[in-house]
Every structure is written in structure tokens, then in C-alpha cells.
Amino acid sequence: MKLILLGAPGAGKGTQATFISKQFGIPQISTGDMLRAQVKAGTALGLEAKKHMDAGGLVPDAVIIGMVKDRLTQDDCKNGYLFDGFPRTIPQAQAMKDAGVPIEFVLEIDVPDSDIVERMAGRRAHLASGRTYHVKFNPPKVEGIDDVTGEPLVQRDDDKEETVKKRLEIYHSQTKPLVDFYGKWAAEGDAKAPKVRKVAGVGSVDNITKSVFEALK
């Protein structure tokens, strides 16, 4: 199973990635982890990436694709792999296609923006203990107060409504073109093109997981 998993922040992509990984015995591949590993190991690609990072720039796609190809030669990828959060842009998707990185499925977990805003903007946290609540789905006994210490709860900056909406805007502007890119490739009748699937990410986790596995048949 070789797939790319797409989903907005707060869509529950991480949960489904874990289930897919376990079900098919494949690793989740995160470019952030790859970058850190290569920089730490001092490889040629790692040193090249570090040069750009130290200068405050973005690591060029060619370097990232080099790392991806290197990562896919490792033993744990023999049954496949799951790309989470990559590619993010058309040039990255095109570079993967040009490099001949095999992909069987592109799966998007689709959740309406209004649901994501409700999920994320309703989160409250007790920072000292790491306990989290939700004003609607998992409220504290007393509004705005931690159940254990009686201390006030806070809303993290990342969970503020305007921040969530901004992140969703960025996600849609990047992801819609990606889905179109893979859809167009599949429409050309190329046997190497992945199948593009969309699953509704609302409802119980079990039902979403069932839909995910159904889509990957």
C-alpha cells in the first residue's frame, strides 16, 4: 500500500494515519522527521538542507525528493508507505511523479470547515498538566476551570478561531490544486496514476476508519 494522505488541520488525519499504518504494516513518512534524521547523520543531502535552513530559507524540492527516494529504499518500506503532509505543492507532486515515486492512492479526509472550527476553537487546556477539554464535547465540571486543580483553563493561540480559519485557507489553496493534479493524471489513463479517493471525516472514529479501508480497496 503506497499512499498520500490529505486532510485539513483538525480533520483527524493523524488518527487515521495510525490505523492505516498498523493495518498495512507500513511506515508514516514525514518530511520533517526525514530532514532531522539526515541533518543529524550529516549526509550530503542533510548538509545541503542544513545550509538552506541555517540561512532561513526553504529546503529546495530537489533535496527533499532526494531524501524521499533514499527513505523509500529502507527495509520498513518494502510493503509500502504513507506520506503525511507531503507533497504540499504542485511542483513537489510533479517532482515525485518525475522521480518515479510509486503512489497507488491519494486519499483526502474531508471535513466541513465549520466542523473543524468548532472542533479546534472549542479546545481548552490546563497547560501545567497537559489536560485538555472541549467546551462542547468534553467540558470541565465548571466552565473555564480545570477539574483537578481549580485553576483557569486557557485557549491556545493555535486553537483561536481566526488562526484556525487562516490555516484552513492555506490548506485549501494548496490542496485543491493537488487533488486536481492527481485527478487529471488519472483521467489521462496512465497506469502509474494513483486512484483519488475522498472520505467524509465526520461521525464516529470507527465509521470513518471503516470508510477509509473501504476506499483503499
UniProtKB/Swiss-Prot annotation:
This is Adenylate kinase. It is an enzyme of class 2 (transferase). CDD domains: ADK (cd01428). Belongs to the adenylate kinase family. Residues 122-159 are annotated as: LID. Pathway: Purine metabolism; AMP biosynthesis via salvage pathway; AMP from ADP: step 1/1. It is found in: Cytoplasm. PROSITE patterns: ADENYLATE_KINASE. Monomer. Residues 30-59 are annotated as: NMP. Transmembrane segments: none annotated. Keywords: ATP-binding, Cytoplasm, Kinase, Nucleotide biosynthesis, Nucleotide-binding, Transferase. It catalyses: AMP + ATP = 2 ADP. One of its GO terms (molecular function) is ATP binding. Its EC number is 2.7.4.3. InterPro entries: Adenyl_kin_sub, Adenylat/UMP-CMP_kin, Adenylat_kinase_CS, Adenylate_kinase_lid-dom, P-loop_NTPase. AMP binds at T31, R36, G57, L58, V59, G85, F86, P87, R88, Q92, R156, R167. GO terms for biological process: AMP salvage. Gene3D superfamilies: P-loop containing nucleotide triphosphate hydrolases. ATP binds at G10, A11, G12, K13, G14, T15, R123, T132, Y133, G203. Catalyzes the reversible transfer of the terminal phosphate group between ATP and AMP. Plays an important role in cellular energy homeostasis and in adenine nucleotide metabolism. One of its GO terms (cellular component) is cytoplasm.
